[in-house]
Amino acid sequence: IVPRTETMKGMNGTRFAQAYIEVLEQYASPYFMNNGDELIGYESDEGRELLTQYLRESGASLAMVEQNDQSQNITWPGTVELLNSIDYHGIRVFNEWGYIQNRYAYCGYTGPEEITNSFFRAIVERNCKVIWLKMILEPDNDVSWDADQTEWTYITDPAAYEKMILDLDARLEPMGYT
């Protein structure tokens, strides 16, 4: 379990950092994945130090989410400084963006094969260590940048997800990935 929260300006000081870090500790989270306007605790020196100390002492990594163009990672003010202070103990996360979620029955396939291909390339070619798995979209959804995500419809058959994960495992295992 990797707990996530969303930071908001004006509500992200020492108390918030302390409370969130307690949740990370409770679940022994292997990594910290930020979400929101700024890094956890960023509004106070003490809050920033609490996050740094937690990452150093727990051995948890800082999760860096890959941008949708796959060129860099999404960062917040203070990310580079945080990575420096924890000796670059970070991992790259592949986010299953809407256009990837929408690749069911795509390119001549009849199921999630192209989504599996995207996961495989992220792991093998771009060194992503975590896949941020999301629901698979039905093929006819509008995933343009201004699409209304509340209108999206999803594949709900568990067999599609099982196939996707088992096929990925089968492709990665001979290469030494577990």
Language-model-derived ranges and their functions:
Residues 1-178:
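Soluble extramembrane regions of membrane proteins in the secretory/endomembrane system
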